[in-house]
Amino acid sequence: LSRGLGDVYKRQQMIIGATPEHDYEIMRVAETLYQKFDLKRVFYSAFVNVNHDSNLPVLPGGPPLLREHRLYQADWLLRYYDFKVDELLTKDRPDFNIYLDPKCDWALRHLEYFPVEINRADYHTLLRVPGIGAKSASRIVKARRMNKLDFSDLKKIGVVLKRALYFITCSGRMMYPTKLDEDYICRSLIADRTQIPREIREAGYQQLSLFS
């Protein structure tokens, strides 16, 4: 735990992959640090055996960069999107989906909440729609006071429609005729290569061989 200038810059770093904890356990620790210790930020670092010390664990697939990325995405959901760890993971399902970001994965497992009507949903509901960020949600709420919004408006606002289109309607209509089916939407989302950042795709570690 680091402190600076009072306790304004409290932060914690966790090394990922050196010990056998699941993502669920790691995120529960982070959630506790935020809620009970008022931490400003938790950092996650993929374990790298820099000195090749034989006493340290060897990770055949290389540093778990994709796992680190998913933890950061989930951390963002905790801090800015009102998610709780127990909504994202459980003891029976303790690790994040490597193929999908945590928000998309949550939405797929809770299709009963979708589609969301853009012109009526409140701010907190909009936050849970894949492809809609905090700024976009605020802009939607503000813009629809003047006029009903359509999909072209959402694109201008900054909504990532290639993800959001499966989960929203504008004035009762979806962007395209779309089946609200978990397998169908999952396959479509996985086909979106932005689910895995380019720098990780290009890293060349064995952990990414599933995506080649």
Protein language model annotation of sequence segments:
Residues 1-9:
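Single conserved hydrophobic/aromatic residue that forms the stacking wall/gate
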Residues 2, 19-80, 140:
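Radical SAM enzyme [4Fe-4S]-AdoMet core and its adjacent flexible, acidic
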Residues 10-13, 47-52, 87-102:
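A glycine-rich phosphate-binding loop feature that marks nucleotide/adenosyl-phosphate handling sites
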Residues 13-19:
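A conserved mid-domain beta-alpha-beta active-site/ligand-binding segment of alpha/beta enzyme cores
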Residues 67-97, 124-127:
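C-terminal accessory region of radical SAM enzymes
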Residues 95-125, 151-212:
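C-terminal extensions
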Residues 143-144:
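Residue-level signature of tetratricopeptide-repeat
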